[in-house]
């Protein structure tokens, strides 16, 4: 049965009233327009929907504003929050006169997957992102000619041990950097995260766990690995669910990498593997039971890490996180199990689970662009046999200053990242996956 037929059958079975067509803007934000379900038939999935591209930041000028959304029928799901039964579908953006993919559509991740197959290196790339976030009770900000400020607060925050609370301060709080894995009542968000995970499961997402993270008010939910574009779609759904469930509880969520000074920031560690002919390409007999191809893949990521920062760490706040300490992976080194380098090989007994984890990305990244860029860097490493050098199995932050100074780092600012991308972007242009217009 075709994807379109399945989508139309879902509409009928669920008695759908509306269809929400969604797409991703250059910043990684989900956008949408809602249509009466009566307008959606088989032709709609082929003909698409026209919209004003000049109203999306970074896209068209007003004199060339017409653009078209083409729904991807394989991406449909029922929205869990709308009052009226609504089916959602993610879209690709195309030029209306040529029907060609729009060069600035973040869903170029599809082209990266096609490039992998065409290269002969592998058939499929699997991605497992781990996006952390903070939950607060109160967030205030002000940007005026006289003041620029923001303020955050949460009853569960470590700084509220002496706060006056209406029903009494029960003192069940994790201390500074003490948030990792405590049970309730210290972990006060257990049920909130559980509802988030259950909602994702009802939407058809593959999930596996949830827990409190190290920093005060910091959390993480687990996505089971999937294809590159599928997981980029899932990160958008992940954020959508987390924001909306928290909102229903009277709380607010931020995926900002470093919302407060002096505590751990939020990363989006990205686990990656490549399979070919039904077999894991990264399993072998080299360091940490990796294959030579996996080591070359790591070499590509380490070589291009500074250019990648422009896409995996795209905001000024990203570089408040990428500083020594706070478990931040600023050093361009790799290791098995060692979390102080920017690439880690998680321990596993199963060859099928052998993977590479890039630790420097953060959840402010556009997932389509970040995942596609990471894959392109790794494939460049395999194609050009880029040696990653020896692994670093020590705690790199405990090295003597002279040894630490010899280890290269990721970028320290967005300005540096953009400069590095300008100098090093040819690997992204291979197969026309990215364009200079991107």
From Swiss-Prot:
Its cofactor is Mg(2+). The keyword Membrane does not apply. InterPro entries: Gln_synt_N, Gln_synt_N_sf, Gln_synth/guanido_kin_cat_dom, Gln_synth_cat_dom, Gln_synth_gly_rich_site, Gln_synth_I, Gln_synth_N_conserv_site. Mg(2+) 1 binds at residues 130, 269, 357. ATP binds at residues 208, 271-273, 339, 344, 352. The activity of this enzyme could be controlled by adenylation under conditions of abundant glutamine. It comes from the Bacteria. One of its GO terms (biological process) is glutamine biosynthetic process. Mg(2+) 2 binds at residues 132, 213, 220. Disulfide bonds: none annotated. Gene3D superfamilies: Glutamine synthetase, N-terminal domain, Glutamine synthetase/guanido kinase, catalytic domain. Its EC number is 6.3.1.2. Coiled coil: none annotated. One of its GO terms (cellular component) is cytoplasm. SUPFAM superfamilies: Glutamine synthetase, N-terminal domain, Glutamine synthetase/guanido kinase. The modification O-AMP-tyrosine is found at residue 397. Binds 2 Mg(2+) ions per subunit. Residues 106-438 form the GS catalytic domain. One of its GO terms (molecular function) is ATP binding. It is an enzyme of class 6 (ligase). It catalyses: L-glutamate + NH4(+) + ATP = L-glutamine + ADP + phosphate + H(+). Oligomer of 12 subunits arranged in the form of two hexameric ring. Catalyzes the ATP-dependent biosynthesis of glutamine from glutamate and ammonia. NCBIfam families: GlnA. Belongs to the glutamine synthetase family. This is Glutamine synthetase. It comes from Rhodobacter capsulatus (Rhodopseudomonas capsulata). The lineage of its organism: Bacteria, Pseudomonadati, Pseudomonadota, Alphaproteobacteria, Rhodobacterales.
